[in-house]
Amino acid sequence: MKKRKTVKKRYVIALVIVIAGLITLWRILNAPVPTYQTLIVRPGDLQQSVLATGKLDALRKVDVGAQVSGQLKTLSVAIGDKVKKDQLLGVIDPEQAENQIKEVEATLMELRAQRQQAEAELKLARVTYSRQQRLAQTQAVSLQDLDTAATEMAVKQAQIGTIDAQIKRNQASLDTAKTNLDYTRIVAPMAGEVTQITTLQGQTVIAAQQAPNILTLADMSTMLVKAQVSEADVIHLKPGQKAWFTVLGDPLTRYEGQIKDVLPTPEKVNDAIFYYARFEVPNPNGLLRLDMTAQVHIQLTDVKNVLTIPLSALGDPVGDNRYKVKLLRNGETREREVTIGARNDTDVEIVKGLEAGDEVVIGEAKPGAAQ
């Protein structure tokens, strides 16, 4: 009886083992085949750029000030007006400068009259001295009288020298007064557009220490872009690199130029250090305006017709610029070592290790997802 139970128990165990084996085999045979997201390696172009935010300014901008004090009697322009070089912009009350000219001219007339009188007196003194010399030879006059005549002649000569010096000084004052009269006319130092008016008509300007600003002119035909670049990126920049930008109102239009310079003085913004890279762009249609925000791209590298793969295809690093990548062949994956070159935020150049047509694994597809 015991023997029969033992045999039956063995049959049950064997049956369980067989069933478990069959289940395992079924699972293996019906397990989903792993699928991968892949990409065929092909030649292409690769660009590496620095992204930055910038502001637009006019390449040439000048503050037009007053060099004399007085009331701004006339202001002939308004904000937005386009002016030509030497065009009259405004007039400061010229009365004070005109009165100064009249005063100096009157002083000069008086000095010239004094000089004529002094010349006549000098002529008389010379005649008197000559007469005294002849009389002294016959001892008709004393030597003291002769010395007195000589002194009188020298005094008259010195008076003429003093008057000449006063005439020169007043002539310089007259030239200054005429210049100040010219300064009452505010003219445009260059062609451009009036972008700001600081002093209104009727206001009084005082030019005692520094020239007060009347208005600001900007030449909008060429714009200057100041791109704010982080300290991590600025070390890669140099003059001559290609740069382009778009503006918020027209993101499809690219405005292109070349880096002009990188300002050496940084700016600190919320404990972050930034430098300014500048470049110029033409603005023939006047679409670009002051203080517009620019989305700037500065091109660091531009390689043509090279093999590239996505950065996501790179595996573990194995050395300087060397990585492992997975290739898919006949449904099986294998690793290969590659050497990389230029890279940007999405792709990388393959210098060595892959050929055009190779299929690289960039990820594993989820069950039920298409390759």
Swiss-Prot record:
Stretches assigned to the Periplasmic side: 32-371
Annotated GO biological process: response to antibiotic; xenobiotic detoxification by transmembrane export across the plasma membrane
TM ranges: 11-31
Cellular location(s): Cell inner membrane
A GO term for molecular function: efflux transmembrane transporter activity
Major location (coarse): membrane
Superkingdom to which the source organism belongs: Bacteria
Protein name as annotated: Macrolide export protein MacA
